[in-house]
Design a protein with these regions (language model features):
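Alpha-helical segment of the N-proximal tetratricopeptide repeat
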Residues: 38-77, 81-84, 88
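Canonical tetratricopeptide repeat
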Residues: 81, 115, 149, 183-184
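C-terminal motif of bacterial Sec signal peptides marking the signal peptidase cleavage site
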Residues: 13-15
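Structural signature of tandem alpha-helical TPR/SEL1-like repeats
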Residues: 55-64, 88-101, 123-135, 158-166, ...
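Structural marker of alpha-solenoid helical repeat scaffolds
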Residues: 71, 104-105, 139, 173
């Protein structure tokens, strides 16, 4: 359940990164029309992969991202989506390798920063995860789900005050966070906490 909610959060981030796709086909015989068809095909695979990831169909997301990578081995978006989907499927080591590859290809892709944070979080590397959420916030200070991600990390680390401070920031950006926080296991132990109950409306 919590992974489905995380994917819903991802849906809000899918378009926040810089488009960093570059075509490195150096064949002199490729016309502009042929190149446009190639680019559209790659975009189609990544779009389907992102939709599949958002709906929780990780196998389809991996399949489509892999097809995009086959067409263009330098497609950072495809590596990022495949990495996150792979991690959510249970292979966090392989998922981290793909998100790191995406970062190497496109170090300014903010959407990949979020995916990197989530993969580290799935591995239990909370400090590294928090650093990547903070990188998202450097570029996009009102990124709700990165603020929320930091709140969950502090909750998991047992720092109740910081957790609730960050949760309050997330709710102030987007009140829909209340419903997510009320249901996620990160905050289960807070259900008798007066401040938490006030924040989420329990």
């Amino acid at each position: 359940m919590k992974y489905i909610l995380l994917c819903m959060c991802l849906l809000s981030l899918l378009g926040c990164g810089t488009d960093t796709k570059t075509q490195q086909d150096t064949k002199p015989t490729t016309t502009a029309n042929e190149q446009a068809k190639i680019d559209q095909g790659q975009d189609a695979h990544v779009m389907v992969a992102k939709q599949a990831l958002s709906s929780g169909d990780y196998a389809k997301a991996i399949e489509e991202a892999t097809a995009s990578i086959k067409d263009n081995p330098n497609n950072a978006d495809a590596y990022s989506v495949r990495g996150f989907a792979t991690a959510l499927s249970g292979d966090t080591t392989k998922g981290l390798a793909d998100t790191k590859k995406a970062y190497d290809l496109a170090p300014n892709n903010v959407a990949n920063y979020y995916n990197m944070a989530m993969v580290y979080k799935l591995q239990g590397q909370l400090n590294e995860s928090k650093q990547w959420f903070e990188k998202v916030l450097e570029k996009d200070p009102s990124n709700t789900w990165s603020v929320y991600g930091i709140a969950t990390i502090y909750a998991d680390q047992g720092d109740d005050t910081k957790s609730l401070d960050w949760l309050e920031k997330a709710i102030n950006i987007d009140p829909s966070v209340k419903a997510v926080a009320a249901e996620q296991d990160h905050f289960e132990r807070f259900h008798n906490n007066t401040r938490f109950k006030t924040l989420v409306g329990l």
